[in-house]
Amino acid sequence: MNAKIQVHDKSAWECRQSRHGHLPKLPARGCLIAPSQQFKTTALTDMILRHYTDGRGKSCFERIFIFSPSVDIDSSWGPVKEFVRVNMGVPDSEKCFFHEFDHDALNKIVENQHKMTIAMKEKKGNRRLFNILIVIDDFSDDPAVLHNQGKNVLNTLFTRGRHQNISCWISAQKLTTLS
């Protein structure tokens, strides 16, 4: 008897990927940990605007959602806002930028993406899935967001979000603020 592990009926689903082969494949989860003023937000915006695009301005993500208390006051987010509205064509009526951590909105985003993934997998002949990015930036001072034990949508995103093609990137000042 052959004892090698075999893959049984694995469907091959695709989503857009970065043109840079050294970057993590999407959907990806990641944490950027560094003290204040060490360019975490700058790195996040550059990843969104350059690294996870096709080189001609087409994003690897169909939707980008930013949760950051500084999203409306930090000029680093301005180019991302313009990119989402202009390049990606997301209307102003669709909320993508949150200056407060809105658990209900995040749960709704995850729920909608779950439904979208199921619908796209059921569509005959379709191999490409809708890919979204959720960024949680600058909430190190709020234990209800990053340091919440037990049932938490962030725990769910990091453990099972990939099954719905959800990439999640978190930035924090200290590793101890995450749990």
Put a short name on every predicted segment:
Residues 1-19, 71:
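N-terminal pre-Walker A segment at the start of P-loop NTPase domains
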Residues 3-5, 62-63, 86, 95-99, ...:
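Hydrophobic transmembrane signal anchors and adjacent membrane-proximal interface regions, especially
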Residues 16-18, 30-59, 69-78, 99-179:
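Conserved P-loop NTPase motor cores
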Residues 23-25, 127:
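Short coil/turn motifs at beta-sheet boundaries
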Residues 25-30, 63:
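Pre-Walker A (Motif I) flank of P-loop NTPase domains
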Residues 61-88, 93-94:
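P-loop NTPase motor core
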